[in-house]
Amino acid sequence: MDFCNIALFENVSHHDCERMMQCFHATNANFPAGAVICDYEKTSGRLGIVLKGMASLIRTDENGSRTILERVGEGGLFGECLAFSGNQDAIYVTADTDCEISFITYDEISKRCSNACACHTQITENLFRLISEKALGLSERVEVLSRRSIRDRLLCYFNLCADHAKQTVFSIPFTG
């Protein structure tokens, strides 16, 4: 996958994308379907970029119940919202299909490189935008779940989907 097609590298040239991945000391790894890609309870401090495949960010509660927090497809990021949280929850990422993942440590993104290049600033801005979009999505989720009846929840959800699609015909995520 071309890194320039990833939201984190929006408005960064192809040459600078390649250079920044070297500057970030990015490492690539392949995972078979069903494998644990990253366990944030044990190993935090890494941002993952899905280059191929589909992965799920999962939280396990004290009773062993699993909740899918997010599904991440090609070009998607995971771990960006856990960057500076000091999270101790049982959160991990699993491969839904065979996956190729590129890992970058938070320190490599948050600290300026010795070159102080403009593309590093752009990537940092993109990361903040992606985190903001994710926070907005979570607030929308709270808005839907705070409705009293199932009917009101569905209407609220459908209205949000229509707003995002900017039309009254839209696709619902997690459906075929």
Predicted features and spans:
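Cyclic nucleotide-binding regulatory module and flanking cytosolic helices
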Residues: M1-A33, L82-A83
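Cyclic-nucleotide recognition modules
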Residues: F24, E70-F128
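Amphipathic, well-packed alpha-helical segments that form the structural scaffold of globular domains
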Residues: H25, S132, L136, L155-D163
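Cyclic nucleotide-binding regulatory domains
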Residues: A35-T97
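Basic, amphipathic alpha-helical hairpins
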Residues: R112-H120, L138, C161-V169
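Conserved phosphate/pyrophosphate-binding and hydrolysis machinery centered on Walker-type P-loop NTPases
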Residues: V144-R151
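Phosphate-/nucleic-acid-contacting segments
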Residues: I150, Y157-G176
